[in-house]
Amino acid sequence: KVEEGLKAYSEYNILLDGNETSYYLWKAVKCQEIISQNSPIPAMKAVKSDAEIAGYRRAMVRDGVAMVKFLKWLIPAVEAGGETEISIDKKLTALRAEQDLFRDISFDTIAGYQEHGAIVHYEASPETDIPLKPEGLLLLDSGAQYQDATTDITRTIALGPVTDEMKHIYTLVLKGHIQLELAKFPDGASGTQLDALARECMWREGLNFLHGTGHGVGSYLNVHEGPHQVRMEYMPAPLRAGMTLTDEPGLYLAGKFGVRIENTVLIQDYKETDFGKFLQIESLT
């Protein structure tokens, strides 16, 4: 047991991360000294090996096949009637399950139609599930665990005619998504320094979103992985080549609809100049 091991260990000092260690385990330590600081493991894990990156590339192809099959099926199915937020979630999971090395979904799917799309972390239940109609927007945030990688993708899909307001909001989100994906930046920059790239076109119109623009993605591990993030709040973790990240700006109009566009991306070397090493972003999705 962990507790017994900590009580019995006394030869060297022990490093404990106060953000991740329970008070119960902390009090069980009987070593000479507790060094309280962030664990070095997440930062090392965040930079993916060549084998892990190759796994992402393979898994993204398979996940893309499932998504394309789903998108081909979706519109005719909605037009035929009978589909709901829950039923289309089950269909997408079934298509992913046909792919090699599929093990499970990587998180509970967010399938929000019309006003439900404006709820950032909406999850359909039997009580909230609504039928889909051949009109308006469906926000679909989903992912899978394959044995060689973890995926995370969001698409906002027009199920039929949409309003001019929907088109405008979608365009702003797409602009922000592209702006971040095209970024070139110094090695070691923080995600906070990049965050405004995805928001600037929205800020011009007095619009904003209140979630992070991007998070790390594990390799057949947690779909949300740190320590690096792209968000407005200061995040000191440096961005390095080999890190995976999401690019997912959005806009949400309460009671009306929401738009989010998300790819999983890879940070890569760009060039080295007299001013240092620079990085760029490649979409893996």
List each language-model region with its residue ranges.
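Active-site neighborhoods and metal-handling regions in enzymes and metal-associated proteins
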Residues: 1-285
